[in-house]
Structure formats: structure tokens, C-alpha cells
């Protein structure tokens, strides 16, 4: 019983002092011209999990010269840089996600969907 109380106290103290991860800035509506570059912001306080992105409900991988991290993930910047914007591939609803800080925590983050509009050719 004493071990359980000490363990529970440690978990509570860790959560209070370290804080749970939470969005500082979530992605919002953006527009970009075809062939342009746009940054979808996503900044997280107390980030311990892994940054991920989805477009229209499908996971998006990082690809050099197309989808790249814009900031330092270790410091909580999960922002995504979309290069060479293309209406076929990039137009849609994007979500920033951060996995739980560990398997015992329920602090997974999933942003509201943010629409990225690739403008049509004039």
C-alpha cells in the first residue's frame, strides 16, 4: 500500500510540476499560391510525445523538398512546412498530432482540422 501511495504521489507531482503537454498554437486556415511554400503552425508546451501530421485523415510522412519540419521538435515546435504547394496533393484539412508522453498518460493531442487552400491558377 505504501509503495502504491508513493508511486501515485510521484505521478501527481510529475504532472503538476512538468505539466501535461498541450497546444500553445494549433494550425489554422491558410492559403498558398500553386508552387509556393506555407507553414502550418503547431507548437506544444511540455512536449514529450512525437509530432505527426494528417491530411484528410491520412498520415503524412516527411519528404525532403515537400513536407518538412519547420521548427525544433525537441523544444515543442511541430510546425510543418509545405513546399511546392499543389492543389492535388496539398489542398485539404490538416491536423497536427502529438502522441502520448508515455503509455501510462492520456495526453495525446489532436488539433482541430485546419483547411489549407491551394489557390487555383488565374
PLM ranges: what are they?
Residues 54-59, 67-85:
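Eukaryotic helix-linker segments that join adjacent hydrophobic helices
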Residues 31-33, 41-43, 68, 81, ...:
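Generic structural detector for well-ordered beta-strands
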Residues 58, 85-87, 101, 121:
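Conserved beta-strand elements of beta-rich interaction domains across eukaryotes
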Residues 21, 45-68:
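N-terminal V-set
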Residues 3-6, 32-41, 48, 73-77, ...:
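Solvent-exposed loop/turn motifs of extracellular immunoglobulin-like beta-sandwich domains
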Residues 52, 93-122:
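Extracellular/luminal immunoglobulin-like beta-sandwich modules
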Residues 49, 60-61, 70, 88-90, ...:
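Eukaryotic short linear interaction motifs
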Residues 1-28:
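N-terminal Sec-dependent signal peptide, specifically the hydrophobic helical h-region
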Amino acid at each position: 500500500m505504501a509503495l502504491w501511495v508513493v508511486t501515485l504521489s510521484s505521478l501527481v507531482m510529475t504532472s503538476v510540476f512538468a505539466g501535461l503537454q498541450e497546444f500553445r498554437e494549433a494550425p489554422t486556415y491558410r492559403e498558398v499560391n500553386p508552387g509556393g511554400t506555407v507553414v502550418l503552425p503547431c507548437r506544444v508546451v511540455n512536449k514529450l510525445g512525437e509530432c505527426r501530421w494528417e491530411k484528410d485523415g491520412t498520415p503524412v510522412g516527411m519528404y525532403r523538398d515537400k513536407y518538412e519540419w519547420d521548427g525544433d521538435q525537441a523544444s515543442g515546435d511541430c510546425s510543418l512546412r509545405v513546399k511546392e504547394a499543389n492543389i492535388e496533393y496539398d489542398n485539404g484539412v490538416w491536423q497536427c498530432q502529438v502522441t502520448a508522453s508515455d503509455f501510462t498518460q492520456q495526453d495525446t493531442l489532436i488539433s482541430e482540422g485546419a483547411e489549407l487552400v491551394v489557390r487555383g491558377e488565374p
